[in-house]
């Protein structure tokens, strides 16, 4: 693990002590982030970021070897371990129970390779009186158990609050559930492996972003799902954000969901990009564009041949005026060579396969059209001499006419509940609701 960390551009691990016996091993490892190298590579004046040395922490590892291990108790397994980070160098900035480390992870690697562990971060607080800043964190506890070839992990924290002179933020009931195939070292390296996860925050309240204004969010959720196709050496990644309710100044929405699927990611391309990204951290900023072009020329075609997809599988919300629902699918197909220039829009359109649909309740569509019409009117010289009532009357008169015109042109289609629009793109030709539309950059 130490070697893997040292292969990362800005991280380092140093074994400070190592003592291996018949039944146990104890080690101290110093973990550091090389901010100085980052600063030097990006030509940042180091006086702007005063730092005597790179920030670091020391982790202590105690492992009791199996198959029968003796530690705090007796058990069966390949190894029983405990990793702790005292974090004493952080106590100048953050306060917590003096008898506890800032992080503790204790677990067992079973006889057949399954991993179970529990980890804890204690309650924390931080105060900067001059800046009027306060942070309070209730602490965090997690547990992992093996489930066949996977590891199941659940964790929770009661609350997190941050307050400053300008604003305050309070989160309650934080939790995370994960199921994964890989290990911690693989995750640190950025390797892709099959996993599912969901993080939740039951309530969020943000105050004083604007004077006297408060934003409240209920049940914010973030979900991920990674699938690996070993036969084709590709991965599919799905990410979803969801909010049950959000209320604030000029904001009142429920049942909000955004789901994005990125499919047919070539794993060799991902590994090459991670290596490039890692190495580029220490490359002077003026050299990065040229290095990026070298990477693209050497690796992009591999990804394009896998026919990647970026799909918005879900986009929906309910507003006071009504609800809308949308999706959009895009896929690059039939590419066996890069274009002469990546800015060749006609080339990409030829190889782009897309379809999209949006539906909206009638009242919501009318409200959106009214807003658009108001913007158009306000941009005209005549609007300068009109009262607010006259502007609103003009909008109410012209909005139905605009919607009818769009419907006659085939840009929208009226349904029983509202309006819908369908867009397709194939072989460089686009259509809206079945009506062909010209593209300014279509191939000739």
Features from the language model and the residues they span:
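Glycine-rich, small/hydroxylated-residue low-complexity segments
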Residues: 2-444
């Amino acid at each position: 693990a130490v070697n893997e960390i040292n292969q990362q551009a800005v991280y380092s691990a140093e074994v400070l002590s190592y003592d291996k016996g018949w039944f146990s091993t104890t080690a101290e490892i110093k973990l550091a982030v090389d901010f100085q190298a980052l600063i030097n590579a990006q030509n940042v004046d180091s006086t702007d970021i005063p730092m005597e040395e790179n920030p670091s922490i020391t982790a202590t590892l105690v492992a009791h070897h199996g198959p029968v291990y003796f530690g705090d108790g007796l058990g069966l397994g390949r190894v029983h371990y405990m990793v702790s980070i005292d974090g004493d160098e952080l106590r100048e900035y953050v306060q917590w129970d003096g008898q506890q480390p800032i992080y503790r992870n204790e677990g067992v690697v079973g006889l057949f390779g399954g991993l179970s562990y529990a980890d804890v971060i204690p309650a924390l607080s931080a105060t900067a009186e001059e800046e009027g800043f306060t942070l309070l964190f209730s602490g965090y506890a997690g547990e992992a158990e093996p489930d066949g070839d996977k590891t199941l992990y659940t964790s929770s924290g009661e609350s997190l609050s941050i307050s400053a002179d300008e604003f305050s933020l309070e989160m309650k009931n934080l939790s995370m559930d994960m199921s994964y195939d890989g290990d911690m070292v693989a995750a640190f390296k950025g390797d892709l492996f099959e996993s599912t996860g969901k993080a939740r925050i039951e309530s969020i309240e943000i105050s004083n972003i604007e004077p006297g204004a408060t934003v409240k969010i209920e049940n914010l959720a973030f979900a991920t799902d990674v699938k690996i196709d070993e036969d084709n050496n590709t991965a599919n990644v799905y990410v979803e954000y969801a909010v049950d309710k959000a209320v604030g100044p000029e904001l009142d929405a429920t049942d909000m969901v955004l789901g994005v699927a990125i499919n047919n990611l070539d794993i060799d391309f991902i590994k090459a990009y991670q290596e490039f990204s890692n190495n580029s951290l220490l490359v002077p900023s003026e050299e990065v564009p040229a290095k990026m072009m070298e990477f693209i020329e050497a690796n992009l075609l591999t990804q394009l041949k896998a026919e990647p997809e970026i799909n918005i599988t879900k986009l929906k919300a309910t507003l006071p005026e009504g609800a809308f629902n949308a999706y959009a699918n895009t896929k690059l197909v039939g590419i066996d060579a890069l274009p002469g220039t990546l800015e060749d829009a006609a080339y990409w359109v030829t190889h782009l396969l897309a379809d999209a649909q949006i539906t909206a309740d009638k009242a919501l569509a009318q409200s959106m059209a009214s807003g658009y019409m108001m913007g158009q009117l306000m941009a005209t010289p005549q609007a300068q001499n009109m009262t607010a009532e006259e502007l609103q009357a003009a909008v109410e008169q012209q909005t139905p006419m605009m919607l009818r015109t769009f419907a006659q042109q085939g840009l929208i289609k009226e349904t029983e509940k509202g309006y819908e629009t369908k867009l397709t793109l194939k072989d460089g030709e686009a259509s809206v609701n079945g009506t062909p539309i010209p593209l300014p950059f279509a191939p000739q």
